[in-house]
Amino acid sequence: MSIFTPTNQIRLTNVAVVRMKRGGKRFEIACYKNKVVGWRSGVEKDLDEVLQTHSVFVNVSKGQVAKKEDLISAFGTDDQTEICKQILTKGEVQVSDKERHTQLEQMFRDIATIVADKCVNPETKRPYTVILIERAMKDIHYSVKPNKSTKQQALEVIKQLKEKMKIERAHMRLRFLLPVNEGKKLKEKLKPLMKVVESEDYSQQLEIVCLIDPGCFREIDELIKKETKGKGSLEVLSLKDVEEGDEKFE
């Protein structure tokens, strides 16, 4: 599709229009096809790679640019880049049924890939294949949400799959190096956040190697920094504690 915009004499091609209604008026932005989903999923972070122009339109196909007073009334600002971000994040993508179906299929696969990459069977510590995660998602009738990032949806899928199968996020392996004086007291605070303590060594420092749920990493990191006043250290030994091989389920 080629759109001619007489206001600035730019011919926009390969256009995906994202629309938002605000304050009783319609606002549109012109994006590159296949880039909107990437922005919303967090894969694409460069706004210039997504937007064909930083202008806000009332009608992209006719090249009608929104009036400054209408932007201020609807969005509280006339900063078109910021308004473009709002529309890009929350607006409705104008695509054909075929394009929408293709996008949703791709997001479905992306979500399954994230889940397969981050999770294991807790009994065998082995990962599931992407194909089997896709099958499980279909079994629970998971419906992709086009306006939500694939990472957020992957977390939702994991929660729902836990009710139907043996699955959990793979543990991270960490090493703590803590001053001996603060270490013993800090260890008690860290205990509830550690899944498995693999080794402890008391010498000049307290060294602990353990497995944790990835969701606890930030809390542990902040706790160590706060309690040791920067004297302690935290090292990630492995992001995923898994066994080799693929776990299959029917």
UniProtKB/Swiss-Prot annotation:
Gene Ontology molecular function: microtubule binding; ribosome binding; rRNA binding
Signal peptide positions (record)? none
Q: Which InterPro entries match?
A: Ribosome_mat_SBDS_CS, Ribosome_mat_SBDS_N_sf, Sdo1/SBDS, Sdo1/SBDS-like, SDO1/SBDS_C, SDO1/SBDS_central, Sdo1/SBDS_central_sf, SDO1/SBDS_N
PROSITE patterns named among the record's database cross-references:
UPF0023
Compartments in which it is found? Cytoplasm; Nucleus, Nucleolus; Nucleus, Nucleoplasm; Cytoplasm, Cytoskeleton, Spindle
What is the stated purpose of this protein? Required for the assembly of mature ribosomes and ribosome biogenesis. Together with EFL1, triggers the GTP-dependent release of EIF6 from 60S pre-ribosomes in the cytoplasm, thereby activating ribosomes for translation competence by allowing 80S ribosome assembly and facilitating EIF6 recycling to the nucleus, where it is required for 60S rRNA processing and nuclear export. Required for normal levels of protein synthesis. May play a role in cellular stress resistance. May play a role in cellular response to DNA damage. May play a role in cell proliferation.
* Keywords in alphabetical order: Acetylation, Cytoplasm, Cytoskeleton, Nucleus, Phosphoprotein, Ribosome biogenesis
- What name does this protein carry? Ribosome maturation protein SBDS
Q: Which GO terms describe its cellular component?
A: cytoplasm; cytosol; nucleolus; nucleoplasm; nucleus; spindle pole
